[in-house]
Amino acid sequence: MRIGMGYDVHKLVENRDLILGGVKIPYEKGLLGHSDADVLLHAIMDSLLGAAALGDIGKHFPDTDPKYKGADSIKLLEFVGELLNKNNYKISNIDATIIAQRPKMAPHIPTMRENIAKALNIDLDQINVKATTEEGLGFTGSGEGISSQSICLLVK
């Protein structure tokens, strides 16, 4: 068994879509990044890659490579799932947290879980997503950005 941890953060800006867990969430701001800036999927990918000792998303999808400009993170997650399979790793479970003051995530979490399970070809009960605020503290609490953390367990 191998445990992996992932973390990602992006700044909220105007004129960008807010995409988390592959879900476009109605909001006046979106996350700034080279790809679609889906912090939830980025944290999940880093936890999976870390558990398998396969580097991180910066290694596999560098922001200096124009082919990842505006990339759909669900497609990147599918690639990570294939990479795990190729290296004989199976996902036992993933537990992830979105940290954002606004907007409310609860209505979107079921679809996020479905998207992640489908992309990784795992059962829905193997992926948990939850959300919390930081009670107005720090950059997430002030609405400057959104972060996400993920932990996973892999078996070989």
UniProtKB/Swiss-Prot annotation:
CDD domains hit by this protein: MECDP_synthase
GO biological process per UniProt: isopentenyl diphosphate biosynthetic process, methylerythritol 4-phosphate pathway; terpenoid biosynthetic process
Cofactor(s) it depends on: a divalent metal cation
InterPro entries reported for this sequence: MECDP_synthase (IPR003526), MECDP_synthase_CS (IPR020555), MECDP_synthase_sf (IPR036571)
EC number: 4.6.1.12
Residues annotated for a divalent metal cation binding in this entry: D8, H10, H42
Main EC class the enzyme belongs to: lyase
The protein's annotated pathway: Isoprenoid biosynthesis; isopentenyl diphosphate biosynthesis via DXP pathway; isopentenyl diphosphate from 1-deoxy-D-xylulose 5-phosphate: step 4/6
GO MF term set: 2-C-methyl-D-erythritol 2,4-cyclodiphosphate synthase activity; metal ion binding
Coiled-coil segments on the chain, per record: none
Protein residues bound to 4-CDP-2-C-methyl-D-erythritol 2-phosphate: 8-10, 34-35, 56-58, 61-65, 100-106, 132-135, 139
UniProt remark on cofactor binding: Binds 1 divalent metal cation per subunit.
Highest taxon above the source species: Bacteria
Family statement: Belongs to the IspF family.
Function of the protein: Involved in the biosynthesis of isopentenyl diphosphate (IPP) and dimethylallyl diphosphate (DMAPP), two major building blocks of isoprenoid compounds. Catalyzes the conversion of 4-diphosphocytidyl-2-C-methyl-D-erythritol 2-phosphate (CDP-ME2P) to 2-C-methyl-D-erythritol 2,4-cyclodiphosphate (ME-CPP) with a corresponding release of cytidine 5-monophosphate (CMP).
Protein name stated in the entry: 2-C-methyl-D-erythritol 2,4-cyclodiphosphate synthase
Source organism of this protein record: Clostridium perfringens (strain 13 / Type A)
